Amino acid sequence: MKRRRTFDWVSLLKRLHLLPERLTRKTEAEDLLKQLYDHEKSTGKSPDRLTSRDLNLSPDQLEALQLELEQEGFTEPGALRLTEAGRQRALELTRAHRLYELYLAEHSGYAPEEWHRLAHTKEHKLSECDHERITRLLGNPLFDPHGDPIPTSQGAEPSLPTSLSIEELSEGQWYYVKHIEDDEAESFRLLIEAGLTRDSLFRLERIESARSQIYYEGESLELPTFALVALTLRPAQSHEVEAAHSEEAIRLTHLTPGIEATILGLSPSCRGAMRRRLMDLGFVRGSSIRIDMHSPLGNPTAYIVRGAAIALRHDQARYILIHRPSHAQASE
């Protein structure tokens, strides 16, 4: 399934001043509201001492948005202190954002790099009825696709799990990814390209100040060390590594002609429609698989699985994990 790319019409309309001023101001005010709430939650302090520079706004912008929030009853008069109604609205926006990100992950063809932007636009438009409809569709989820907890309709928001710091990581140790921070676009892009996602297991092979190397799904991957900071990690348990076959699993793209392998499962990065399609086609644990033929340009490749020939592109085949063939098989 080809991932969809979208054009950001809302940003274009803003730049051309074609978006209704009231709608633009309300959206920007709610963005500020979330900033104030996040500051209050992360620091435990009232955000009333924040300046326009702290919030990356001009003094005039801050004054206009502050007035908007006051009129809605979300902040106290003449200050940036949140009212209870303001905290509740900030939680509603957070709930809408994370629900919609999960909806995109499970029921759309959009690339992971686009989920945050699309959800940021949609969060201001979803009603409580929309929240409940999406919640039922997704089966009352607790977390978004990155591992962020989804606030409940009653306003309860679980805390993020604690993470090991970079200084606490050890070479040779297996780690379990509990959460990926998507606010830093460059780090998120690098992690997604590597195939890392919530519930991934990897072994840290080398860690240095600038570059680090991990072993993941049969590949040694080099990443800037700053990208690892975006991961919430804990040491993986031995039974988790064994259950996921992390030591012997490799991506289907590494299968060589003439070798028959056994499918171990699908990568945790394979979600939604793509995951359902691959499973429907027979790419499930225990199935035998071999290469039927390569296309003249090498992509796609036809595989024989459950008696049928199925062509997959490289970006689809990398989601399928197989048991690493033994040396005896490879030499036959």
Give the label of every model feature segment.
Residues E70-L80:
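A short, conserved structural fragment
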Residues S200, S287-S288, A308:
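Structural motif
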Residues L99-F143:
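Amphipathic alpha-helical dimerization/coiled-coil segments
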Residues A79-H97:
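Basic, amphipathic "hinge/linker" alpha-helix immediately C-terminal to the N-terminal HTH DNA-binding motif
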Residues S42-N56, L80, V177:
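Short acidic, hydrophobic short linear motifs in intrinsically disordered regions
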Residues H124-L266, M274:
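Mid-protein regulatory/catalytic core that forms ligand/cofactor-binding pockets
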Residues K2-Q35:
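Short alpha-helical segments that sit at the start of domains
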Residues N56-Q71, E186-R189:
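Short amphipathic alpha-helical interaction segments
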